[in-house]
Amino acid sequence: MAAAALKRMRGPAQAKLLPGSAIQALVGLARPLVLALLLVSAALSSVVSRTDSPSPTVLNSHISTPNVNALTHENQTKPSISQISTTLPPTMSTEKSGGASVAPHPSPTPLSQEEADNNEDPSIEEEDLLMLNSSPSTAKDTLDNGDYGEPDYDWTTGPRDDDESDDTLEENRGYVEIEQSVKSFKMPSSNIEEEDSHFFFHLIIFAFCIAVVYITYHNKRKIFLLVQSRKWRDGLCSKTVEYHRLDQNVNEAMPSLKITNDYTF
């Protein structure tokens, strides 16, 4: 009886404990789900930031290229001015040798040139850059010839150049002819295709004739016997022979016999 009473008391207590345990289980499941969602959101934000980050670098690269070009052109213009300044003293020496009383002008120092370049307007610098971009080759040629005293390059073609050009033209023609011949082999004309089709048809007929001859040669005895049997039948069943019924024309068939009523045994 006591055991039964204890079981009855435990039943309601367990029923009360079941909702609390279910709530704890749900809370335990919700925590890892929340952590997983946080990790996924952090990963997505990092990926988006990585994909968005290269765009400003590309823009900076596009923006920085003109500045680099401008700096290179400025660096090219500065040595040209210094080189021009170095070529000025010989002209003054020639004037002195001629006897003319002209006061020598001092050559500008590099510091004064840099200050003058810095004081110049940006519009003038842009015009100089445009002029250098329009004709860089002529400026370089003049500077090179002035520095080293080399003669101008003769752009006229010589006989050797003409021979080389003729050789290259002949080689190109040879390559073109070879390519055309290869194309003609690869892509035959319609006439060749028609001839091929006729040849195939004639080949089939020739093979059929060879098969007939082979069969007749190996079966010539049978064919000969068949022909002879047909001739024998034609001889027996010829249209020239007339057949008569024996019961009507017995006298004609056997004239030695006579119809008599006397029979001998």
Curated annotation (Swiss-Prot):
Residues 72-123, 135-168 are annotated as: Disordered. Residues 114-123 have a biased composition (Acidic residues). The modification Phosphoserine is found at residues 229, 256. Keywords: Glycoprotein, Membrane, Phosphoprotein, Signal, Transmembrane, Transmembrane helix. The chain crosses the membrane at residues 197-217. Residues 50-196 are extracellular. It is a single-pass type I membrane protein. Residues 1-49 form the signal peptide. Residues 72-96 have a biased composition (Polar residues). It comes from the Eukaryota. Glycans are attached at residue 75. Residues 218-265 are cytoplasmic. GO terms for cellular component: membrane. InterPro entries: KCT2. The keyword Glycoprotein applies. It is found in: Membrane. PANTHER family: KERATINOCYTE-ASSOCIATED TRANSMEMBRANE PROTEIN 2 (PTHR16502:SF2). This is Keratinocyte-associated transmembrane protein 2. It comes from Pongo abelii (Sumatran orangutan).
